[in-house]
Amino acid sequence: MKAAVEKLDKNQVLLEVEVEAPRVQKAIDQAYRRLVKQVNIPGFRKGKAPRFILEQYIGKEPIYNEAAEIVIPPAYEEAVAEHQLEPIDRPEVEIVKVEDGEPLVFKARVEVKPEVQLGPYTGLEVERQEVEVTEADIDAYLKRLQERYAELEVIEDEPAAAGDIVTIDFKGTVDGQPYPGMEGNNYPLELGSGTFITGFEEQLVGARVNEERTVNVTFPSDYHEKDLAGKEAVFQVTVRGIKRKKLAPLDDEFAKDVSECETLADLRQDIRRRLEESQKQRVEAAVRQAVVEKAVAAATVELPEVMVERRIDARIRELERNLQAQKMTLEEFLKNTDKTIGDLEKEFRPGAERDVKTELVLEAIAKAENIQPSQEEIDAEIERMARIFRQDPDTVRKNLGDLSVLKYDIMIKKTIDFLVEHSKPVPPREQGAAGETAETAEATPA
């Protein structure tokens, strides 16, 4: 087989492939055997008509076309591999010549991954935050634990206060008319949690059991449901019950109740360790993101539109899945937000372009540095997945198929590892931006 490649504009290439005559003849014979079984020819049992009779009945062209469908796909793949091309779309194929006893010639026009002009990607200066956990962080964490494990006391003779959980019946109107979804009974609401629209919960502070209150609120101008954006609403609310959190004292018994620690001092030490580990992970994630962003910004590449469009489509499909989890269709979301699919595509384009460029640049760096996953790394990742899914490693390997996605993911991770290892850490301009507080940490110690 012979294959020549010509570079065209906009990441397009033209392959001209000539497949040797014996291989073509074998495909023609195979095509005849396929077609003769599909055609009813008077005087012959199905599949038994000689080729010249079949040709008289349907002509030579269908046989040649069938032969081309047999020959071209594998020949195209061989030509792509020979010239180390990376197609990103389906090829446009033109059959130039196919006949008995002759080579088959075809042309394939296809868009390939573009060449990336890499900028500097080693020695990049990246800010690295210091990991620091204060006593105040630990105190705040403990406060959250107290809140989480608090007992609820029924309040009968006192007014509701911020932090109390009130059980309410409510019915809302807009412009004097009931509105779907603005009604509920026996709804538990923590005052100050921000669960309801701004101003709603504040107006229930001071209410007593069985008290009725009129609550007036205004929906934000950017409210997700466009029909309510900027509108005033009136709610008739009845407080059916009040419960108040009773916090346990911070002592050794509390430590035993909420963790495996024996003393409060041990619990504080365990919390410090957890917060430090969580901060380290956040700092490392920030460093990895920063070094990738710098390497990508320094590179130049013409983004293939087909890759960008696919990434946009993927984002829309992800949105659709998230909406389904909320019992909402994409059509309902578009109606509520007064948007069109075109608006979403425009909104998602910058992120899609950023993702595509990042992918291309990381691949180019991996190629330049000859970064590939080792068999040990592949096996280790399969073992890790097997532990997570509680499956046998052989089962995981079988489910993964040819492992191409796994190998790619490992390659990208190793490439980012390389960038981090060859970066230059510098002190942050403002200390503490990556520091973690108890508000963002995991709430349950071991």
Curated annotation (Swiss-Prot):
InterPro entries: PPIase_dom_sf, PPIase_FKBP_dom, Trig_fac, Trigger_fac_C, Trigger_fac_C_sf, Trigger_fac_ribosome-bd_bac, Trigger_fac_ribosome-bd_sf, Trigger_fact/SurA_dom_sf. It comes from the Bacteria. GO terms for cellular component: cytoplasm. It is an enzyme of class 5 (isomerase). Residues 423-446 are annotated as: Disordered. GO terms for molecular function: peptidyl-prolyl cis-trans isomerase activity; protein folding chaperone; ribosome binding. The keyword Iron-sulfur does not apply. The keyword NADP does not apply. Residues 432-446 have a biased composition (Low complexity). SUPFAM superfamilies: FKBP-like (SSF54534), Triger factor/SurA peptide-binding domain-like (SSF109998), Trigger factor ribosome-binding domain (SSF102735). Residues 163-248 form the PPIase FKBP-type domain. Its EC number is 5.2.1.8. Keywords: Cell cycle, Cell division, Chaperone, Cytoplasm, Isomerase, Rotamase. One of its GO terms (biological process) is cell division. It holds the Pfam family FKBP_C. It is found in: Cytoplasm. It catalyses: [protein]-peptidylproline (omega=180) = [protein]-peptidylproline (omega=0). Consists of 3 domains; the N-terminus binds the ribosome, the middle domain has PPIase activity, while the C-terminus has intrinsic chaperone activity on its own. Belongs to the FKBP-type PPIase family. Tig subfamily. Involved in protein export. Acts as a chaperone by maintaining the newly synthesized protein in an open conformation. Functions as a peptidyl-prolyl cis-trans isomerase. This is Trigger factor.
